[in-house]
Amino acid sequence: MVSTRKVHAAERPPFEVWLDSLSLSEETKEKLHHVSSIPERLLVGQEMVEILCQLNMDDVTLQAALVFPYCEQHALSENDIAQEFGEEIRDLVVGVRRMDAIKSLHARKISGSAFNEKSDEQHIDSIRRMLLAMVEDVRAVVIKMAERICALQQVKKADEETRVMVARECASIYAPLANRLGIGQLKWELEDLAFRY
């Protein structure tokens, strides 16, 4: 079952006040300000935090999830994250980013070969195993699954090919991975959202 979330609109200090409170270089602050001017990018981190809060994840995981979209948009470097938020958060973000290499491998496999159910099943299972092996902290995998849920919600306005590719990736890799890790809520949500496409 898909959870309906609403990014909380509780009173927060303006973005500029929060940004000024961070001890970042002016160049980095400018990048963050540019990224924050596009509301969808900001909401991804908040949505990921809401997903992870439902799983009772620790504060470090929540902070890494909130910072991750900024790193993806190249508004924060890994060094900026380590300096401002700490090594542990940086390591989680790096682990999540490392998992993106699998996306391109899976996309090449889908587009580059004829359908062979047994070989595809073995390939996908080996991808799942690689994902677990390549990250040092399983929390990075959970953050990535939350990010994929957000990606499934965002692709509804994309072209058909993109929607199908993201849905296949989530249904064949991340939903079974969530099941393997015993996180039923994420598994169901990934499957339900992927089924739409």
Label for each model-derived stretch:
Residues M1-Y197:
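Active-site helical microenvironments for divalent-metal-assisted chemistry
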